[in-house]
Amino acid sequence: RVLCDGRNYSDDHVALLRVQANDTHPRVRLDALRACSWVNTAAAAEVALEVVKHERDYYIDYALEEAIRGMEPLWKSAISSGKPFAANNPAGVEYILGSIPTADLANLPKSTPVLLAMLTRPAVKAQARQDALVGLAEFKKTDEMTELLSAIDYVDKTDAPGAATVIYDLVLMLTRREPGELAESRARFEAWTKSAKRAITRRIGYVALIAADESVDPAWKLATRSLDSLK
C-alpha cells in the first residue's frame, strides 16, 4: 500500500512491486496487484502477471482480472509491437493470451506463446493450425512432429473447454505424418495408452500404435493387460 501511495515519488516502485507480487503471503500479492493497477504501465502489467506463478484464490483472481482489463491498451500495444513482454513468465503470457480472441491473436507478431495458442485453441482453421505448427518448430528449432506430439500432451492435460475437439484436430494432423515419423514416436503413443489424462487420448494412443507398428497385434496385447486403459 505504501508503494502504491508513493508511486509518484519512487523510481524503482515497479521493481519493488515485482518482489511483493511474488511474496509467499497471498495478502501481500493481492496488495501488489492493486498497486499495479494504479501504476498503469506495460511494466506494471508484467508485474501483475507474476501472481499467476503462485496459488490464487477468488480475491486474487478478481483483482488480476480487473488489473489486466484496466491495462489492456498498454499490454496489447506491447505485445503487438513484437517487443519482449513477460518473457520469463510463460504462465503469465498464457493467461493474458487467453483473453485475446482468436481472430485478433492471428494478427499478433509471431512468437512461441502466440503460435502455441493458435495450435492448441478450439475453432482454429486447419491451415492456420498447420501454419502455427510449422512456425513453432522453426521458433524452437525442433521439428513439426516433436511440436505436434507436445501439443497433444499439452491439450490432454488441460481442462479448457473444447479440449477434446482440439485433440481430434491435432490427431488429424498426426495422420498426415510420414510412416517413419510414426514409427519413431512409438514410445510416446504407448505412454498415451497408459498415462494420458483423457480417455480419448488413451484410445488415440492405441490407434497410433497400430499405425506405427502396421499391425494390430502389439496394441491388442498391450490393451488386454489393463482394461482400465480402454475406458
Residue ranges, per PLM feature:
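Long, ordered, helix-rich scaffold segments
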Residues: R1-K231
